[in-house]
Every structure is written in C-alpha cells, then in structure tokens.
Amino acid sequence: MASLIREWVGINTFASATQTKLLELLGKLKQENVNTLTILVMGKGGVGKSSTVNSIIGERAVSVNPFQSEAPTPFMVSRSRAGFTLNIIDTPGLIEGGYINDRALEIIKRFLLNKTIDVLLYVDRLDAYRVDNLDRQVVKAITDSFGKGIWNRAVVVLTHAQLSPPDGLPYEDFCFKRSGALLKVVRLGAGLKRRNKQDFALPVVLVENSGRCNKNENDEKVLPNGTAWIPDLVKTITEVVSNGSKSIFVDKKLIEGPNPNERGKLLIPLIFALQYFFVVKPIERAIGDDIERESRPSWDN
C-alpha cells in the first residue's frame, strides 16, 4: 500500500536547529541533482522500524501499536519539501515462528517492483545483547532478494539507544561491541569475502524513538553520548547516497532470478563437452581397441 505525496509539514515539528541541519543536507542532495530519495526499511519484527519512519518524517505516518502484530504489507510514506521528495517504505518483519517469513519477503519484493532503492535502513535493537543465526538468515534473505550491492547502499540503525549498558560498561564501548557483533553477522550473511572488508564500511547510527529521549540546550533529541540523532541519521543517509555506488532498481529479473531456460542454454556446451570427454571418447577408444584386436593375425593373439 502506498500513500499520496504530501507536503512535508512534519519537519516543522523538529527543533529549529534540527530543521536547519535537515534542510542543509537536503539542499546538498539537490545540488547533486538528487530530487527524489527512496529509503527501504527492513529487519525483524518489533525492532522499531515503523517508529523510526515516524521519527524521520516528524509525524505519526505509520501506525505503531506494541500490543498488535505488524501490518502484513509494506507501506510507503511520501513527503515533499521545496522540490525534494522523500519516500520511506516500511515493511513487515522478516521472521515468523523462528524462521524467515518467505511470504512476507515475496510481498515486499512484489511491492518494490519497478521502484528504485536509494538507501536500505537495516534496523535492529541496541539493547539486543546477542546475535545469532537468525540474524544471519535475515541478512542472507535480503541479500538473496536484492543482491550484495544493496549493502553498499545500507545503514545499520540500532534503536532503543537511550539505555544504561550492563555491567557498568561505558556507553561508547557497549555500542562499539554491539554494532561490531552485528556487522560481523551482516558480512557473513551477505557473503562478503575477506578481500571486500576494507571496501565494506557499513555505517551504524543509533536512534531513540521514544518520548523519553533526552534533549540538548537546542531542544534537539540527543543520545547519552550527546549526539543529536535525527540530523545524524539523515546526514549518514545523504553520505550513502553520495558514496559512488549504484541505487538498486527492482525489476522482474531481480525478483524472479535468472530465467531457468536461459540458464539451461548456458549449460548445454558444458554438457556436450562432458559427454564428449567422458562418454564419446571412451567409446571411440574401446571401438578402436576392438578393431585393432580383430585385425591382428590369430597367431599374434
């Protein structure tokens, strides 16, 4: 389900300092001839995807209810400001019953048909203290659906960042360890080889969507480390847009994969070669040996 493009009035709800930073960042994109930005938000259920969408927009554009399951279909929020259009696509969680929800993934892919993904926000919780194989499966499912290139356009977003780390750990140390563990899983799930790691600088941004988020003297929402997180997130998104990698256009081929008939045609020469060397040649040798034996004089046997 998609919404009509509306005037981005939610930006007026931000603190003046935040508004100024956001308009400067969007102005830089327009200078680079980027007039439309489409952000895809993905991850497990209950991690704060919809709340993050609402925080960026500055209004309750997507329904959020902690006591109800997520919407089963994607939803695109579109807002326009001074000739710039921002599209954010909220999606259902990719896990159901401890496994990848293939049906949800298929619905997401069909929804994205003929759309261009400029940035992927991969959302998880900062206060999830461990990663496991399920995280790897989610990353692999995204990679299998949209290709490895999607991670060149990605930002890892860790929600619930207004926390006190366990065991008296310094906040920065805890965030570094948590994000490092998740980034390792992303590399494994995306199938990025060791030689790619230097080129794979996946940015991580911390966010706090709840009303209890602290504020600084400029009335901006800030994290325990003092970062004004809304402009920090938007700044990181604009940096990804400008990093030189290509946006992901979701066409039918990307969704359905290679044509099996075309794939079969590519295998025909290989099959013929194998048949020749392992079937035809041995038969020819055997026939030649038989002819040679039959042509010998009986006394030579």
Segments and roles (model prediction):
Residues 1-301:
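Conserved GTPase G-domain substructure that encodes guanine base recognition and part of the catalytic core
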